[in-house]
């Protein structure tokens, strides 16, 4: 007996006859726009902060967060879901540092995030807690380790991939095309900032300002991240074409 479309919609671990998991697809639809660009010097993350009301305080919306001093993450999607994942990643990195007296590798951190992302669905025979649906958030994880700067993308399906430059969320198809045309491994960190914001500017519905965009960098020289304040962000925006 075949299931109806609505039953496939509700089933978080039931594939449709076309091989689709609708709950994962719905989670992907919740993702907004974010861009990451990696070069030899470090990684740049730029994320749109969509303000739904003029009464909203822009500083209360945080789209780039710290996982560890050498790891940052741009989140796109449901913030409550992202908080659960980020808290998990922070615990994993601190446990690794406590046990091995060294910072956790970027890929290892991403792997732990994606392991958590896969824990959804019915929980009949396991003692572990699970989400009843996929996490509605995608992440761009940037970090520095012994391999140098790296940029990873993870989506609600629990898949992760390493990129030199990546756009996620609404309008990401056009943004990714721009990145493919203009990206070069020889870019400096300043040029990566400009490329990320220029690409963001092209696909955003509103004019880019210091209140609707968040910019962060993590550099190999400093081995730590920096989130730009309004004055620093305004200086970079002024250089855009």
UniProtKB/Swiss-Prot annotation:
Q: Which UniProt keywords apply?
A: Cytoplasm, Nucleus, Proteasome
Which Pfam family is one of this chain's hits?
Proteasome_A_N
Q: Which InterPro entries match?
A: Ntn_hydrolases_N, Proteasome_alpha, Proteasome_alpha-type, Proteasome_alpha_type_5, Proteasome_asu_N, Proteasome_sua/b
A Gene Ontology biological process in which this protein takes part is: proteasomal protein catabolic process
Localization per record: Cytoplasm; Nucleus
Q: Does the keyword Cytoplasm apply?
A: yes
What GO cellular component entries does it have? cytoplasm; extracellular matrix; nucleus; proteasome core complex, alpha-subunit complex
Instruction: Explain the purpose of this protein.
Output: The proteasome is a multicatalytic proteinase complex which is characterized by its ability to cleave peptides with Arg, Phe, Tyr, Leu, and Glu adjacent to the leaving group at neutral or slightly basic pH. The proteasome has an ATP-dependent proteolytic activity.
Q: How does it assemble?
A: The 26S proteasome consists of a 20S proteasome core and two 19S regulatory subunits. The 20S proteasome core is composed of 28 subunits that are arranged in four stacked rings, resulting in a barrel-shaped structure. The two end rings are each formed by seven alpha subunits, and the two central rings are each formed by seven beta subunits. The catalytic chamber with the active sites is on the inside of the barrel.
| Protein family per UniProt | Belongs to the peptidase T1A family.
Q: What is this protein called?
A: Proteasome subunit alpha type-5
Question: Highest lineage ranks of the organism?
Answer: Eukaryota, Amoebozoa, Evosea, Eumycetozoa, Dictyostelia
